[in-house]
């Protein structure tokens, strides 16, 4: 575990730290998909995958919110994979090394993968957080956003039941290597 696991909200940063340890280049999302499926199984969360490789997880609404409309939390599994010329790093097998520098979460010599690792972490945290009151939630994790939106365009019919979509986004620009802590 890296020092980012001490940040708040703790669950989000712990999940992001775990996600940074899983290789997830575009078109090679098998390991992160396995991570997501294992996560769903471990936490008894209903899940489904489609032929494209997308994953959807579903949790019911909390007490008093069961009949509210379902909200879809969307994020993507893959990341931009770039490294400094002097960095020995294999995006197919190496974990991202994170650190905090002057209030910023950064990666050591590579892109951070906050786009959209932090979106995945936030969605997973929302599914688990017992203090969060919510209607039914669906968390959609799509493949290959960075190089073609393959997962979004190939989403299996009937995968989603929600009527409202909360699209995950970050304030990072493409290829940026850090995220500021607010």
Where are these regions (language model features)?
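Charged catalytic carboxylate motif
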Residues: 11, 122, 170
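Phosphate/pyrophosphate-binding betaalpha-module
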Residues: 167
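Acidic/His- and Gly-rich active-site-bordering loop/insert found
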Residues: 3-103
